[in-house]
């Protein structure tokens, strides 16, 4: 599913991401834009053999199990396929674990490079939330 910007913002808010660990909703929407272009079915292979999954491009080396990543830790205890659903519950629950891990949203390269220090509020402007 390719989400609309405000549609994804509303779903993220409903699942408790707004100000989770101090990150406003705009941060999460911005991260999703540059990680997956709001596409829940996005997958991208990394040079280390791991794959990133879903709207927040969650990585199979650490966070989920896809059955093909050597030494996968599966810290969110989920199959990676759960991260490709149009229901973002699994993605959000795993993202909460990731952002609590010590590096905050710096865990997302796209957030670090394209969202951090910018006017992320713009990503939810005009949305009825």
Curated annotation (Swiss-Prot):
Protein location: Secreted
Annotated catalytic residues: 35, 52
Protein function: Lysozymes have primarily a bacteriolytic function; those in tissues and body fluids are associated with the monocyte-macrophage system and enhance the activity of immunoagents.
Annotated disulfide bonds: 6-127, 30-115, 64-80, 76-94
Main location: secreted
Pfam family, any one: Lys
Assembly and oligomerization: Monomer.
Catalysed reactions, semicolon-separated: Hydrolysis of (1->4)-beta-linkages between N-acetylmuramic acid and N-acetyl-D-glucosamine residues in a peptidoglycan and between N-acetyl-D-glucosamine residues in chitodextrins
Domain C-type lysozyme residue range list: 1-129
Organism listed in the record: Colinus virginianus (Northern bobwhite)
Chain's gene name: LYZ
Source organism, top-level taxon: Eukaryota
A GO cellular component entry from the record: extracellular region
CDD domains, sorted: LYZ_C
GO aspect biological process, one term: killing of cells of another organism
PROSITE patterns, alphabetized: GLYCOSYL_HYDROL_F22_1, GLYCOSYL_HYDROL_F22_2
The UniProt record lists the keyword Secreted: yes
The protein, known as: Lysozyme C
Transmembrane segments: none
Top-level EC class: hydrolase
Recorded GO MF terms: lysozyme activity
Further comment: Lysozyme C is capable of both hydrolysis and transglycosylation; it also shows a slight esterase activity. It acts rapidly on both peptide-substituted and unsubstituted peptidoglycan, and slowly on chitin oligosaccharides.
The enzyme's E.C. designation: 3.2.1.17
């Amino acid at each position: 599913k390719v989400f609309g910007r405000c549609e994804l913002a509303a779903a993220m808010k409903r699942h408790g991401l707004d100000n989770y660990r101090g990150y406003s909703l705009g941060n999460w929407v911005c991260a999703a834009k540059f990680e997956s272009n709001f596409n829940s079915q996005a997958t991208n292979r990394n040079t280390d053999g791991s794959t990133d999954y879903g709207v927040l491009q969650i990585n199979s080396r650490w966070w989920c199990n896809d059955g093909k990543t050597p030494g996968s830790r599966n810290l969110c205890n989920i199959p990676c396929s759960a991260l490709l659903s149009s229901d973002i519950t699994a993605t959000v629950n795993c993202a909460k674990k990731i952002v609590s891990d010590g590096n905050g949203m710096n865990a997302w390269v796209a957030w670090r490079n394209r969202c951090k220090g910018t006017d992320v509020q713009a990503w939810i402007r005009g949305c009825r939330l």
